[in-house]
């Protein structure tokens, strides 16, 4: 029995019939791991097809992780698991409690409908570039966290444009891709505006912004808010003892700095929420109880993952801002 048999009366397109033929051969064990497939030219000539039709079929099988190609040698069987229609490439910056929420939300939507491979670039531009280059052409969809890395659009340009989705952070170079992202400048300004009445009890507002991982939009929203209401403010890159004084309020994106500010305040007998104020970024259950509650600005990470999962499965491409809110607690 031939691997591929084209039925002119079939309701399936010819390239899909090629795909189904390979799937049948895998399920019937007529093809095994690392077996060589017939060449594109051979399949085309034997079935009266164009090379483009066969290439389209083989490309889909590659994206689903069923076959792989070696330049100059041909196509070979990579996997016998053909039950998933989609093989997804998911690139995160790092794994922390917030990103785990995104991942769990994404999995909740995807369930068993697709095969998923997850990678991490750890904010390293070279690792990002390498992972993108090595994945090109091997997956049906690419869900990518570019974070604040420079020139990510150059690496992403190697991927099929119609298969790319951007997650969490986007930028002007990536604005043409569908995304579920945070609007950092808008969220910062809106959050501070909502607690403006509390800020009148303090003298100066600080944003602790190291600039390594944090989005620049945080700075933009912070500075715009402070300029509009003429509130004394400063963007600092690290915490010094002399910053922690009565009347200071700190916006803290990084939890390491949150611990540092609290420790310095305790050493100097400063009460959180009375002598100094704290607004932390990204809510977790622990922040409900630390120092009787830490005020937070946070997006819904789990919902972000679910929204992206729905978008990938539905094929409905949009650019969506994930909602953010400020949770007022005793630290302000």
Located regions from the model:
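Extreme N-terminal segment that seeds HTH/winged-HTH DNA-binding domains in transcriptional regulators
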Residues: 1-45, 319
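An alpha-beta-alpha
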Residues: 190-229, 320-332
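Amphipathic helical "hinge" segments at domain boundaries
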Residues: 40, 64, 75-133, 139
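Flexible loop/turn connectors
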Residues: 246, 256-332
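Periplasmic-binding protein-like
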Residues: 89-90, 138-147, 205-210, 246-254, ...
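Flexible loop/hinge segments that line or gate small-molecule binding clefts
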Residues: 148-186, 282-292
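N-terminal helix-turn-helix
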Residues: 32-69
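Hydrophobic alpha-helical segments within soluble ligand-binding/sensing domains
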Residues: 170-206, 258, 297-317
